[in-house]
A protein has these predicted regions:
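A short, well-structured juxtamembrane/interface segment
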Residues: 38-56, 68-71
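Short, contiguous, pocket-lining structural segments
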Residues: 5, 9, 37, 41, ...
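Extended, H/D-rich, highly charged conserved domains that either
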Residues: 61-77, 81-83
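Short hydrophobic beta-strand segments
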Residues: 57-64, 136
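Amphipathic alpha-helical interface surfaces
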Residues: 45, 72, 155-159
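A short, structured active-site edge motif that brings together acidic residues
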Residues: 87-92
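Surface-exposed, charge/polar-rich loops and edge strands
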Residues: 2-33, 51-54, 79-82, 93-245
């Protein structure tokens, strides 16, 4: 499938899910299109996630900064877990915020908010992160094979690839997404080699374990546009020179 056709197919799935969420009044967003849905069952999904052994055993997690995953970040900090959260658009040389539950200047419910975290949390480079026990992603759509779609910017995939190359995640690192049940689709989700699939889907009323989800082995430079690399310092600083000739 050509890139343009692939993008169109992905966008068609996103639009279907956004429309379904809007019709069901299942989100807090005034307009959910173009966003990771802030679904109304986010707290229930976080509570269900917190019952899983993979959560209970995790000491260090990376979680997206989206509103839908705020209850996950709050729980993690309240339970003494270290939380890494990406700087918006990975736009700084040190692209992750470090939320250390032992040194928070405000309660976890405040510290976990992305804007508050940005006001106090130190930023760290990829190589300075501790190995991750668990990764929590937001999604627009996900199917039972673990294939997922974000809002289309690709930042979660880039983060994962950078962490994979740094040895901070492995094939066995669990990746979870929390979603509304309406975001779980039986539609085939078109994917590419750089797309990160999830191991576990957690909705307010169900948990789905996915088999053999796809993982990129690292940064697929040929899939990145020059302007993407330039805009993300962590990529630009790690780009390997092209072979001479």
């Amino acid at each position: 499938m050509a890139d343009s056709s692939l993008d169109q197919a992905k966008q068609a799935v996103r639009t279907q899910i956004w429309d379904a969420l809007t019709a069901a009044d299942a989100v807090h967003d005034a307009s959910v299109h173009g966003r990771i849905p802030h679904f109304k069952g986010a707290e229930e999904a976080a509570a269900r996630l917190a019952e899983l052994p993979v959560w209970k055993n995790a000491e260090v997690i990376k979680c997206v900064p989206d509103k839908a995953q705020l209850p996950v970040r709050i729980r993690a900090l309240e339970e003494g877990k270290t939380v890494y959260m990406a700087v918006p658009k990975l736009a700084t040389a040190k692209p992750f915020y470090l939320l250390d539950p032992a040194t928070l200047p405000v309660p976890p419910a405040e510290a976990a908010q992305s804007r508050v975290a940005a006001s106090f949390a130190p930023t760290v480079d990829v190589d300075a992160l501790s190995p991750l026990d668990l990764i929590i992603l937001g999604s627009v759509a996900v199917n039972r094979t673990g294939a997922r779609l974000g809002k289309g910017a690709g930042y979660s995939d880039i983060e994962f690839a950078l962490l994979m190359e740094a040895g901070l995640v492995t094939e066995s690192t669990t990746v979870v997404t929390t979603v509304d049940a309406l975001q779980i689709t039986d539609i085939r989700i078109p994917t590419t080699d750089h797309d990160v699939a999830v191991d576990v889907i957690v909705a307010p009323n169900k948990t789905i374990v996915c088999r053999a989800p796809h993982r990129p082995s690292g940064v697929l430079w040929s899939d990145l546009a020059a302007e993407q690399i330039t805009a993300i310092p962590a990529l630009a600083s790690r780009r390997r020179p092209s072979p001479a000739g």
